[in-house]
């Protein structure tokens, strides 16, 4: 997993509330366990509308997505996080996320940042014309206009994202300690 420390650049100013996982990646794209190729289906129903933010060349390749309230609601589909990541997005900012989406996003190295609605509205305005900087280590989102929005994040999730580790990778960092423990256990309890 790629480490997430500072995410800087333009942001897709989506701003819509209640974007469910079927809008993020429609069900007919879920027939694969391959993470590649899902970006083409990401936000398909929104992209079908003329003038949508995802097809606007000003935002092409934006590493940040700014959404409205209740982003990622609906069914659990890890493909939603995969599709967003494949678009090049490293962080999503919203007033609230579905718990299951937030968990899937974290497990796939996609940072979710919860900010008050007024702060999200300000970022949506800025994102239309200017870049945004998200600093995970200091837990702050900044704009070129001296706006500073602090956010909370679970310390475990923060550590994993900063180090580019998923739960398995974090466990494997302690492989030597695990092996030592298993050796001691085997010698203390040879019958096991």
UniProtKB/Swiss-Prot annotation:
Subunit structure: Heterodimer of LeuC and LeuD.
Catalyzed reactions: (2R,3S)-3-isopropylmalate = (2S)-2-isopropylmalate
Assigned GO CC terms: 3-isopropylmalate dehydratase complex
Function of the protein: Catalyzes the isomerization between 2-isopropylmalate and 3-isopropylmalate, via the formation of 2-isopropylmaleate.
Species this protein is from: Zymomonas mobilis subsp. mobilis (strain ATCC 31821 / ZM4 / CP4)
UniProt keyword annotations, A-Z: Amino-acid biosynthesis, Branched-chain amino acid biosynthesis, Leucine biosynthesis, Lyase
Short name of one Pfam family: Aconitase_C
Lineage: Bacteria, Pseudomonadati, Pseudomonadota, Alphaproteobacteria, Sphingomonadales
GO biological process: L-leucine biosynthetic process
Stored NCBIfam families: leuD, PRK01641.1
The protein, known as: 3-isopropylmalate dehydratase small subunit
CDD domains registered for this protein in UniProt: IPMI_Swivel
Keyword set includes Cytoplasm: no
Enzyme Commission designation: 4.2.1.33
Molecular-function annotations in GO: 3-isopropylmalate dehydratase activity
InterPro entries documented for this protein: 3-IsopropMal_deHydase_ssu, Aconitase/3IPM_dehydase_swvl, AconitaseA/IPMdHydase_ssu_swvl, IPMI_Swivel, LeuD
Top-rank taxon: Bacteria
């Amino acid at each position: 997993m790629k480490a997430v420390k500072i995410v800087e650049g333009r942001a897709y100013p989506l701003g819509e509330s209640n974007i469910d996982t079927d809008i993020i990646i429609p069900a007919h794209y879920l027939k694969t366990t391959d993470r590649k190729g899902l970006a083409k289906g990401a936000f398909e129903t929104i992209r079908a509308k003329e003038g949508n933010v995802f097809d606007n060349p000003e935002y092409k390749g934006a590493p940040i997505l700014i959404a409205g309230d209740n982003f990622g609601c609906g069914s659990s589909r890890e493909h939603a996080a995969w599709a967003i990541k494949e678009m090049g997005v490293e962080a999503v900012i919203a007033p609230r996320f579905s718990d299951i989406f937030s968990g899937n996003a974290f497990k796939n190295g996609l940072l979710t940042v919860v900010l008050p609605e007024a702060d999200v509205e300000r970022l949506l305005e800025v994102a239309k014309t200017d870049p945004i900087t998200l600093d995970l280590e200091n837990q702050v989102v900044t704009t070129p206009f001296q706006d500073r929005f602090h956010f909370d994040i679970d310390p475990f999730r923060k550590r994993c994202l900063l180090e580019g580790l998923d739960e398995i990778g974090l466990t494997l960092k302690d492989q030597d300690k695990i092996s030592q423990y298993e050796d001691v256990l085997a010698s203390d309890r040879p019958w096991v």
